[in-house]
Amino acid sequence: MVSERSLDVLRAIVQDYVSSCEPVGSKSIVERHSFGVSAATIRNDMALLEEEELIAAPHTSSGRIPTDKGYRLFVDHLAEARPLSPAQRTAIEILLGQSVDLDDVLSRTVRLLSQLTNQTAIVQYPSLSRSRIRHIELVSLAPRRLLSVLITDSGAVEQRVIELTDELAEADIAEIRGAINGAAAGLSLADAAVRLSELPDALADRARALVAPVASALLDQIAANRQDRLMMAGAANLVRTGDDFPSSITPVLEAIEEQVVLLRLFDEMAHDQHSVAVSIGRENDGFGLTEASVMSSGYSSAGADIARVGLIGPLRMDYSGNMAAVRAVARYLSRLLGD
């Protein structure tokens, strides 16, 4: 059974190790923290923590460092809520508030989060498969060429050029625009695809001939853009903390490059009920990231989570500060997309 003081000792070990990158001994704990007990008493507490596999001794030191289990207990029960400073909040509002479109806001988001945390920041694009169609615009580029602009409720804008066999007048384009928006606007991508596939058969001969090629092209456009993807910033931070990956930093770099692993992990984190989900060390074994920690929070549009934003870094990270930054950025991103 771990006592309250032993838990306070664990908190001190995590905080001191994160800040110093040096194993923590009983003497330094007594010197840095106000426990009011002797170093011998602290050593007894550390022995209990080691028995519970919450701390461990590196081979080259008499001090102790947190284990994955120790970090988990810290994150779940000991990490103190640390709000961002007014200056940090102002920086978020100014930088993200200047965004001009979805790509720009996500690019600014990862750069800002990386700067706030000194970690590699990750943001997931809103999945079109979870989005709803706000509007489909058709613009004439030439008599037999249209530009289709698919706009979703998450702010995503997808464009595609449609080549036609017959020339279309402006009145024809207006008729097609009205038909496809009447069928698809307000629906999820999956439901819209069904309605668009059925639409030509529900129209009279002339209207069917006009709408069918455009509906077919829109179906291809929807199918091509339903793959999730990530945007990242701050990968250089991983290189600077390379010593925190004892075996190899390669699996982390490969996960960043290939994205599939992180997308799977983000999908799993979406089921976590905490405002910021944190996956630590061996908890990432199925993803090959046993020497890394990943944290993320969902961001929303129209009241529903549409994707996640977070970061990846070594086990030795400032969990309290990083969780506060991820939470704040996700909330502001949600407000921005909800406008």
Curated annotation (Swiss-Prot):
GO terms assigned for molecular function: DNA binding
Keyword Endoplasmic reticulum: no
Keywords, alphabetical: Repressor, Stress response, Transcription, Transcription regulation
GO BP terms in the entry: negative regulation of DNA-templated transcription
Stored Gene3D superfamilies: 3.30.450.40, Heat-inducible transcription repressor hrca homolog, domain 3, Winged helix-like DNA-binding domain superfamily/Winged helix DNA-binding domain
Pfam family name, one: HrcA
NCBIfam families given in the database record: hrcA
Family: Belongs to the HrcA family.
PANTHER family the record matches: HEAT-INDUCIBLE TRANSCRIPTION REPRESSOR HRCA
Record function comment: Negative regulator of class I heat shock genes (grpE-dnaK-dnaJ and groELS operons). Prevents heat-shock induction of these operons.
Name used for this protein in its record: Heat-inducible transcription repressor HrcA
Gene name, Swiss-Prot/TrEMBL: hrcA
